[in-house]
Amino acid sequence: MVDHISPRASPGPIRSSQTRRARKLRDSCTSCASSKVRCTKEKPACARCIERGLACQYMVSKRMGRNPRAPSPLDSTRRPSESLPSAGSEQGLPAHNTYSTPHAHTQAHTHAHSHPQPHPQSHPQSNQPPHALPTPNGSSSVSAIFSHQSPPPLVETQGLGGDLAGQAQSTLSSLTVDSEFGGSLQSMEHGNHADFLAESTGSLFDAFLEVGTPMIDPFLESAPLPPFQARYCCFSLALQTLTCLFPHAPLGCQLRLTDGEDSSCNLMTTDMVISGNKKATDAVRKILGCSCAQDGYLLSMVVLIVLKVLGWYAAAAGTQCTSTAAGGETNSGSCSNSPATVSSGCLTEERVLHHPSMVGEDCVDEEDQPRVAAQLVLSELHRVQSLANLLAKRLQEGGDDAAGIPAHHPASPFSLLGFSGLEANLRHRLRAVSSDIIDYLHRE
């Protein structure tokens, strides 16, 4: 009766429970806790202490943990796949506290039984972190993380401090992670940086594009881009007006000779000159009525436009050279490009054809054509006179603004003396054109 002892009377389980409670350690080692950084919770030494060469010690926890509870039906269904000890725990090697899947633990269990003394699997040197401990099932666990969309089940931690680590993992598992980004971030938290970088990131980017990329209307993708449009302002209007006043290339222009284009025969008539100058004066009046006219560069361009308009009026009236006033046919009106046939006084860019049958709305004879053209131009000079008065006001304002600016300062192209010279030159040119036309009419 005394020789046979029932197994239920053995105090073994009580001693093991007391021993497990007595050996319960904290989650963070002493070094990580003193530095207030997150510990990887690896035993016997964490990755941070191994990397820094520190002594990794885990102090005994003051809390004994929860009392053991009765196993639930849900635990009994998960117990066969979760309670398999890893090969690292059998050999005394630490195992990573990472999330895993039943498929991964099945592979780990197969390796543990087929190899009594397992060795770490051979991986490329670039995939192994320099501070990580070798784990037989690390590669399969990481690959299982990236290959499953559903949240991984809970894994019981083997070794020291299993209860408290299991509570921490159960808290983390309550957070819903329903994308591959969650698994990758959890793998990064547990120190598997090299394994995370070694995995293919194509599926991660595909998942991101499916969720975060907005849909683009196919019509918008196929729509052509709008044509380039230049900025329209007073400066662009002044440049366009000045360009229209130069329809012909000069006789000695190298570009005209290189391109082979001859525009000397495309002469303008008196009606074309009157119409073009009217458009130019309207554009100048619009520019001078804008606040942009206070700019010195724009005022300089306006002065050039008005001077060019006066040049075309003089050419239409036939008062540019003596040969034009004396005879109806001029050298500039011919299609000859030879400079020797044109006198030096008639080498001008404003070339007007003086042989039309119509001048304005009147049909005139060939003999009366120069006189009628001169009278028509003289009647149009009032436009230039009003522009000269308005421009003089703007030039005076620009000169007042430039009074305190040095002559070499880039804020204004001319000094006060330069603006005064522009006004004087413009008025002198206007008086010269009008007096030449009046003298020509008196001679006729």
From Swiss-Prot:
Membrane in keyword set: no
Outcome of substituting residue 431 to L: Abolishes interaction with aflS
Protein location: Nucleus; Endosome
Gene Ontology CC terms, in alphabetical order: endosome; nucleus
Cystine bridges: none
Composition bias type Polar residues, residue spans: 136-149
SUPFAM superfamilies: Zn2/Cys6 DNA-binding domain
Gene3D superfamilies: Zn(2)-C6 fungal-type DNA-binding domain
PROSITE patterns: ZN2_CY6_FUNGAL_1, ZN2_CY6_FUNGAL_2
GO biological process, any: positive regulation of aflatoxin biosynthetic process
InterPro entries: AflR, OAF3, Zn2-C6_fun-type_DNA-bd_sf, Zn2Cys6_DnaBD
Molecular functions per Gene Ontology: DNA binding; DNA-binding transcription factor activity, RNA polymerase II-specific; zinc ion binding
Annotated spans, Disordered: 1-26, 64-167
PANTHER family: MONODICTYPHENONE CLUSTER TRANSCRIPTION FACTOR-RELATED, OLEATE-ACTIVATED TRANSCRIPTION FACTOR 1-RELATED
Role this protein plays: Transcription factor involved in regulation of the aflatoxin biosynthesis gene cluster. Binds with its co-regulator aflS to AFLR1 elements (5'-TCGSWNNSCGR-3') present in the promoters of the aflatoxin cluster genes. The ratio of the expression data between aflS:aflR plays a crucial role in the regulation of aflatoxins production. A high ratio, produced at a range between 17 and 30 degrees Celsius, corresponds with the production profile of aflatoxin G1 biosynthesis. A low ratio, produced over 30 degrees Celsius, is related to aflatoxin B1 biosynthesis.
Subunit structure: Interacts with its co-regulator aflS.
Protein name according to UniProt: Aflatoxin biosynthesis regulatory protein
